[in-house]
Amino acid sequence: MIGNWNYGTGRRKSAVARVFIKAGKGDIIVNGKPIADYFARETSLMIVRQPLELTNHAQTFDIKVNVSGGGETGQAGAVRHGITRALIDYDATLKPALSNAGFVTRDAREVERKKVGLHKARRAKQFSKR
């Protein structure tokens, strides 16, 4: 714990989020901007707020997030993972509920690398019979 802030690191795809939470009125600031300005899609906003709504802490904490790497979906997932870890740092009794919802587990799926001789990771060149 840093001062009165609780900390959690979240990761998803190639995005990394450093999340700091403290008691407040529910403001979420991502890279210096309000969350509604940073994430354009409503689904991204919903993903980020899931752990707070599950634990009934949506208006309880002020949250500051530094997130880098990846795209919008990856960053939203990383922020959700970081908020989950910060909530557990704040109150360990929340872990079972968050774990049952699947928020504690890091989503290990990464982009598969492109292979030599193929167009993409698995897409082969078109076969020509003649």
Swiss-Prot record:
It holds the Pfam family Ribosomal_S9. One of its GO terms (biological process) is translation. GO terms for cellular component: cytosolic small ribosomal subunit. Belongs to the universal ribosomal protein uS9 family. This is Small ribosomal subunit protein uS9. The keyword Calcium does not apply. Keywords: Ribonucleoprotein, Ribosomal protein.
